């Protein structure tokens, strides 16, 4: 896809992100954690999220709001939803279960939207080919990048994330990717992290790394955090220079130290 078209898709997706009323969503969904069971395959929202929000070819620049997305997801799955409700929520109202699933899928959607912004930003700014599919995502790989003759897996890693490394190692053994790169991001501002670093007694180095990461991120007016062009450019340069020697899991702190430039 031509860079100009990739830029248009990126801008359209950022316009969608800017319109999200995050404050209202958080107020509505944050206290609701009533549907925490593993969802059966028939209720997996990943295919729908990719269908509605991942449009790398730019065939359409329309992204539905969350309510429209959820309504369509719900209507397509009435039969498996009935089975799920009978199994786990016998005697509960549909309204109770629906609200719980709304909250569950909203949290999933925010994470996926963050992944997609990274991918759209990459396509608009970088030369190395990026691929993302819901099938890969279901296995713990948010995207994969072709660098030389190496296929590098990507995991977008929020600051508070903890368990992805073990999942990533299993994926590497199973799929034989050359390496798995953790791409860290934080919801905190550089100023907040700098204050924590100054007060820290045992974790100052980690906070300094997150300060460095935060300088490559941008907060939209509604609070949604997105990736700056400098972030993906630094990662691409790192992969071009090191792809042939990378193997196994490349953890977030190594990426922050060696791939990202300082503020």
Swiss-Prot record:
The gene is tthHB8IR. It is an enzyme of class 3 (hydrolase). The keyword Ribonucleoprotein does not apply. The lineage of its organism: Bacteria, Thermotogati, Deinococcota, Deinococci, Thermales. Its EC number is 3.1.21.4. One of its GO terms (biological process) is DNA restriction-modification system. Signal peptide: none annotated. It catalyses: Endonucleolytic cleavage of DNA to give specific double-stranded fragments with terminal 5'-phosphates. Keywords: Endonuclease, Hydrolase, Nuclease, Restriction system. This is Type II restriction enzyme TthHB8I. Pfam families: RE_TaqI. It comes from the Bacteria. One of its GO terms (molecular function) is DNA binding. It comes from Thermus thermophilus (strain ATCC 27634 / DSM 579 / HB8).
């Amino acid at each position: 896809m031509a860079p100009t078209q990739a830029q248009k898709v990126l801008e359209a997706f950022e316009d969608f992100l800017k319109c999200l009323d995050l404050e209202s969503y958080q107020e509505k969904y944050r206290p609701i954690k009533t549907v925490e069971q593993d969802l059966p395959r028939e209720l997996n929202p990943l295919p729908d999220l990719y269908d509605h929000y991942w449009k790398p070819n730019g065939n359409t620049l329309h992204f539905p709001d969350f309510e429209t997305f959820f309504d369509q997801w719900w209507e397509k799955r009435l039969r498996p939803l009935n089975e799920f409700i009978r199994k786990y929520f016998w005697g509960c109202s549909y309204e109770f279960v629906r609200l719980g699933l709304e909250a569950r899928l909203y949290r999933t959607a925010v994470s996926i939207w963050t992944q997609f912004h990274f991918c759209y930003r990459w396509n608009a700014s970088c030369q190395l080919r990026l691929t993302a599919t819901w099938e890969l995502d279901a296995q713990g790989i948010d995207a994969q990048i072709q660098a030389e003759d190496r296929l590098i897996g990507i995991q977008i890693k929020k600051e508070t994330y903890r368990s992805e490394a073990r999942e990533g190692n299993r994926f590497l053994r199973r799929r034989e990717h050359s390496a798995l790169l953790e791409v860290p991001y934080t919801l905190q501002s550089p100023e907040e992290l700098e204050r924590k670093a100054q007060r820290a007694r045992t974790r100052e180095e980690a906070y300094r790394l997150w300060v460095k990461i935060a300088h490559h991120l941008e907060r939209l007016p509604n609070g949604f955090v997105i990736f700056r062009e400098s972030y993906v450019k630094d990662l691409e340069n790192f992969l071009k220079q090191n792809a042939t020697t990378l193997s196994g899991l490349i953890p977030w702190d190594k990426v922050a130290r060696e791939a990202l430039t300082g503020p």
